Protein backbone atom coordinates (compact mmCIF):
# COMPACT_ATOMS: atom_id res chain seq x y z
CA UNK A 1 0.00 0.00 0.00
CA UNK A 2 1.24 3.43 -0.89
CA UNK A 3 1.52 6.61 1.13
CA UNK A 4 -0.87 9.37 -0.03
CA UNK A 5 1.35 12.13 1.41
CA UNK A 6 4.34 10.85 -0.57
CA UNK A 7 2.00 10.48 -3.56
CA UNK A 8 1.07 14.15 -3.34
CA UNK A 9 4.75 14.98 -3.86
CA UNK A 10 4.97 12.57 -6.83
CA UNK A 11 1.87 14.28 -8.29
CA UNK A 12 3.91 17.47 -8.73
CA UNK A 13 5.34 15.73 -11.83
CA UNK A 14 1.78 15.46 -13.16
CA UNK A 15 0.37 18.82 -12.05
CA UNK A 16 1.49 20.77 -15.12
CA UNK A 17 -1.17 18.89 -17.10
CA UNK A 18 -3.56 17.31 -14.55
CA UNK A 19 -5.57 18.84 -11.71
CA UNK A 20 -7.21 17.13 -8.74
CA UNK A 21 -9.22 18.19 -5.71
CA UNK A 22 -12.10 20.62 -5.14
CA UNK A 23 -12.76 22.75 -8.21
CA UNK A 24 -10.29 20.86 -10.42
CA UNK A 25 -10.95 21.32 -14.13
CA UNK A 26 -9.57 19.72 -17.26
CA UNK A 27 -6.37 21.30 -18.50
CA UNK A 28 -3.80 19.95 -20.93
CA UNK A 29 -4.84 16.60 -19.43
CA UNK A 30 -8.15 15.56 -17.87
CA UNK A 31 -9.06 16.23 -14.26
CA UNK A 32 -8.20 13.18 -12.17
CA UNK A 33 -11.02 13.53 -9.65
CA UNK A 34 -12.76 10.17 -9.35
CA UNK A 35 -10.16 8.41 -11.51
CA UNK A 36 -10.23 5.22 -9.41
CA UNK A 37 -12.36 2.64 -11.25
CA UNK A 38 -13.39 5.11 -13.97
CA UNK A 39 -13.28 3.91 -17.56
CA UNK A 40 -10.43 5.42 -19.58
CA UNK A 41 -11.42 8.33 -21.79
CA UNK A 42 -14.48 9.29 -19.74
CA UNK A 43 -13.64 12.55 -17.91
CA UNK A 44 -16.45 14.87 -18.94
CA UNK A 45 -15.50 17.61 -21.38
CA UNK A 46 -11.99 16.37 -22.22
CA UNK A 47 -10.96 15.70 -25.84
CA UNK A 48 -9.25 12.32 -25.56
CA UNK A 49 -7.23 10.56 -28.23
CA UNK A 50 -9.09 7.78 -30.01
CA UNK A 51 -6.47 5.43 -28.57
CA UNK A 52 -7.47 6.31 -25.02
CA UNK A 53 -11.22 6.44 -25.69
CA UNK A 54 -11.14 3.05 -27.39
CA UNK A 55 -8.66 1.35 -25.05
CA UNK A 56 -11.35 -0.44 -23.05
CA UNK A 57 -9.34 0.16 -19.87
CA UNK A 58 -10.78 0.79 -16.42
CA UNK A 59 -8.50 2.60 -14.00
CA UNK A 60 -8.20 0.04 -11.26
CA UNK A 61 -4.96 -0.02 -9.29
CA UNK A 62 -3.13 -2.61 -11.42
CA UNK A 63 -4.13 -1.04 -14.76
CA UNK A 64 -3.25 2.48 -13.63
CA UNK A 65 0.17 1.41 -12.36
CA UNK A 66 0.91 -0.46 -15.59
CA UNK A 67 -0.16 2.59 -17.63
CA UNK A 68 1.80 5.14 -15.59
CA UNK A 69 4.95 3.00 -15.86
CA UNK A 70 5.06 3.71 -19.63
CA UNK A 71 1.88 5.37 -20.98
CA UNK A 72 2.74 5.12 -24.70
CA UNK A 73 3.57 1.43 -24.34
CA UNK A 74 0.27 0.59 -22.59
CA UNK A 75 -1.86 2.76 -24.93
CA UNK A 76 -0.04 3.42 -28.21
CA UNK A 77 -1.36 6.68 -29.65
CA UNK A 78 -2.23 8.30 -26.31
CA UNK A 79 -1.80 12.09 -26.24
CA UNK A 80 -0.07 11.79 -22.87
CA UNK A 81 3.57 12.67 -23.45
CA UNK A 82 4.77 11.91 -19.90
CA UNK A 83 7.48 9.22 -20.16
CA UNK A 84 6.29 7.35 -17.08
CA UNK A 85 7.17 6.52 -13.48
CA UNK A 86 9.78 3.75 -13.43
CA UNK A 87 9.92 3.63 -9.61
CA UNK A 88 7.44 1.17 -8.09
CA UNK A 89 7.18 3.11 -4.80
CA UNK A 90 6.26 6.27 -6.75
CA UNK A 91 3.51 4.33 -8.54
CA UNK A 92 2.18 2.91 -5.26
CA UNK A 93 2.22 6.35 -3.64
CA UNK A 94 0.58 8.24 -6.50
CA UNK A 95 -2.22 5.67 -6.69
CA UNK A 96 -2.75 6.04 -2.91
CA UNK A 97 -2.97 9.82 -3.41
CA UNK A 98 -5.19 9.88 -6.52
CA UNK A 99 -7.58 7.13 -5.46
CA UNK A 100 -8.70 9.01 -2.35
CA UNK A 101 -10.43 11.72 -4.43
CA UNK A 102 -14.09 11.30 -5.36
CA UNK A 103 -15.59 12.62 -8.60
CA UNK A 104 -16.55 15.90 -6.88
CA UNK A 105 -12.97 16.45 -5.70
CA UNK A 106 -13.64 15.62 -2.06
CA UNK A 107 -11.76 12.91 -0.18
From Swiss-Prot:
Keyword Metal-binding: yes
Pfam (any one): Cytochrom_C
Coiled coil regions, renumbered to chain: none
One GO process term, biological-process aspect: photosynthesis
The entry's keywords: Electron transport, Heme, Iron, Metal-binding, Photosynthesis, Transport
Top-level taxonomic group: Bacteria
UniProt KW Heme keyword: yes
GO molecular function per UniProt: electron transfer activity; heme binding; metal ion binding
Post-translational modification (record): Binds 1 heme c group covalently per subunit.
Disulfide bonds: none
Chain positions recorded as heme c binding sites: 14, 17-18, 80
PANTHER family hit by this protein: CYTOCHROME C (PTHR11961)
Entry similarity comment: Belongs to the cytochrome c family.
Function text: Cytochrome c2 is found mainly in purple, non-sulfur, photosynthetic bacteria where it functions as the electron donor to the oxidized bacteriochlorophyll in the photophosphorylation pathway. However, it may also have a role in the respiratory chain and is found in some non-photosynthetic bacteria.
Protein's UniProt name: Cytochrome c2
Amino acid sequence: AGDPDAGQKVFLKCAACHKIGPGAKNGVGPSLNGVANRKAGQAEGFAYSDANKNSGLTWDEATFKEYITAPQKKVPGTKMTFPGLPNEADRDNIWAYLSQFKADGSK
